[in-house]
Curated annotation (Swiss-Prot):
This is Dehydrogenase FUB6. It is an enzyme of class 1 (oxidoreductase). Dehydrogenase; part of the gene cluster that mediates the biosynthesis of fusaric acid, a mycotoxin with low to moderate toxicity to animals and humans, but with high phytotoxic properties. L-aspartate is suggested as fusaric acid amino acid precursor that is activated and further processed to O-acetyl-L-homoserine by cluster enzymes aspartate kinase FUB3 and homoserine O-acetyltransferase FUB5, as well as enzymes of the primary metabolism. Fusaric acid is phytotoxic to plants such as cotton and banana. It has been shown to induce programmed cell death in plants. In addition to a mild toxicity to animals, fusaric acid exhibits acanthamoebicidal, antioomycete, and antimycobacterial activities. Belongs to the zinc-containing alcohol dehydrogenase family. Quinone oxidoreductase subfamily. CDD domains: PGDH (cd05288). One of its GO terms (molecular function) is oxidoreductase activity, acting on the CH-CH group of donors, NAD or NADP as acceptor. SMART domains: PKS_ER. Pfam families: ADH_N_2.
């Protein structure tokens, strides 16, 4: 069964030097799509797209060599999303099943066999979602998707929590931070949480259970990394999953750390990571899949979403992450399941 459908698509047009401008750096285009699955591949209908600050980093363009490829001019903007399979020529993904992973942000998409088979280090780029607990699908781009896997794999793979230790979670109300706060409390840690507003402070302390928190826009602590280094105990660990506050700044204006000598004095370890790294993904992902959906269904793990509806809201949703207009995970609902 074939046919062709109109297909509104969010397209990358030009690399920005600061905040992206809708209509200049991104655009919406109708890219009609044939409803015929390619050999071994799929046709999908997008349900909910996740939006993340790291997409701004990818807007440096295809020539940018980084942990994920830069976006190509005049190609769809992709990110971690969930979709429904509407045509299939693949034994694993039957029609009607749910698929999550790195997908084009459009009303419909073609998933070739090559993408189904591809991997980014230890992780596949797309995978089947069972949704055994009948959860809202937005969780699979948030707490049960990229944000949750980032939090889980780094917490259990790198933090290596010890009961009674203290952890400072910066951007604690973010989609990753909120999960880390709750995992730390489950493992018996004392949690200090820093956020950018009083509303977020109330959330992380009174709903997520952080022991103490502060609004860094009101407290004279400076940039988080410098005071963290200055106050860290010997053999402390700093885990970095991104630098969202710096993505819209040219290199010469980005934040510099002036107390690096404290790293050797205090024997501090600083570790960057991506959730799919072999050293943390393989040993932790199965526990994540077995545990987190149940915890979310039981309310043991809470999460907050800022949801925008309609693909036409993609620019507004994306920019909200850099202007303080989103809480928790930013998602774009494109269609119903």
């Amino acid at each position: 069964m074939g046919g062709e459908v109109s297909n509104k698509t969010w397209v990358f047009k030009k690399s920005p030097s600061s905040l992206p401008e809708p209509g200049v750096h991104t655009a919406f285009e109708d890219r009609p799509l044939s409803l015929v699955a390619p050999p071994g591949g799929l046709v999908i209908k997008l349900l909910t797209a996740g939006l993340d600050p790291h997409q701004r980093d990818r807007m440096r363009g295809a020539g940018n060599v980084d942990y994920v490829p830069g976006y190509e001019v005049n190609e769809p903007i992709t990110n971690f999303s969930i979709a429904k399979v509407i045509r299939s020529d693949n034994d694993v993904f039957e029609e009607g099943s749910l698929i999550a992973g790195s997908l084009p942000i459009a009303e419909y998409g073609i998933i070739p066999r090559e993408l189904i088979d591809a991997r980014a280090m230890a992780s596949p780029l797309v995978w089947k979602v069972s949704n055994d607990y009948n959860l809202d699908v937005k969780h699979y781009v948030g707490t049960l998707g990229l944000a949750g896997m980032t939090a889980w794999n780094s917490f259990y793979g790198l933090v290596k929590a010890v009961k009674g230790e203290t952890i400072w979670v910066n951007a604690a109300s973010s989609s990753v931070g909120e999960v880390v706060v709750q995992l730390a409390k489950i493992e018996g840690m004392k949690v200090i949480a820093s956020v950018s507003s009083d509303d977020k402070l109330d959330y992380v302390v009174n709903e997520l259970g952080a022991d103490v928190g502060f609004n860094y826009r009101k407290e004279p602590v400076g940039k988080a990394l410098k005071p963290a280094i200055e106050n860290m105990k010997w053999f402390g660990r700093i885990i970095s999953c991104g630098t969202a506050s710096q993505y819209n700044k040219p290199v010469e204006e980005q934040y510099g750390v002036t107390n690096l000598s404290e790293i050797f004095r205090r024997r501090i370890k600083i570790q960057g990571f991506i959730f799919w790294d072999d050293n943390i993904y393989t040993d932790n992902i199965e526990n994540f899949k077995a545990t987190m959906p149940k915890w979310v269904s039981e309310g043991k793990i809470k999460s907050r979403y800022t949801q925008f509806e309609g693909i036409e809201q993609a620019d507004k949703a994306f920019l909200s992450m850099f202007t303080g207009g989103s809480h928790g995970k930013t998602v774009l609902k494109i269609s119903d399941p």
